[in-house]
């Protein structure tokens, strides 16, 4: 790792599997915060990961000296983080789903936007 403050994995869980990452400094985030340019892509997988895949991801994160993996998503993403944490990886999940169905949370990012869109369509 090139002394980066942040390492981004494009494509969500598939990006972690493909080991597709980019290093970024905090200063870069300031630049992106004033533009509408996306700096990372999302992704999903519809299949259950094998233990060997979790081991591979954990090994990659440890080799990059990642202190914590932060992931935003729904139930599947949070279940993924829960399992990955069993491989001694510090994980932090941010509930982000229009369903607002993340256990233990009263609110998720995306829910209010979905409600607003529905109200606009109805009225």
PLM feature spans:
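Short gly/pro/ser/thr-enriched loop/turn and capping motifs at secondary-structure boundaries
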Residues: 13-16, 78, 97-102
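Glycine-rich oxoanion-binding loops at beta->alpha junctions
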Residues: 16-71, 76-77, 109-123
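Residue-level signal for pocket-adjacent positions within structured domains
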Residues: 11, 24-27, 35, 93, ...
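Short, acidic/small-residue loops that bind anionic groups at enzyme active sites
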Residues: 2-7, 85-108, 117-119
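N-terminal phosphate-binding or glycine-rich loops at protein starts, especially the Walker A/P-loop
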Residues: 1-17
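Short, well-ordered secondary-structure micro-motifs
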Residues: 19-20, 82, 104
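Short, solvent-exposed amphipathic alpha-helical segments in soluble enzyme
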Residues: 1, 24, 57, 84-87
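Short beta-strand segments
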Residues: 9-10, 41, 71-73, 92-93, ...
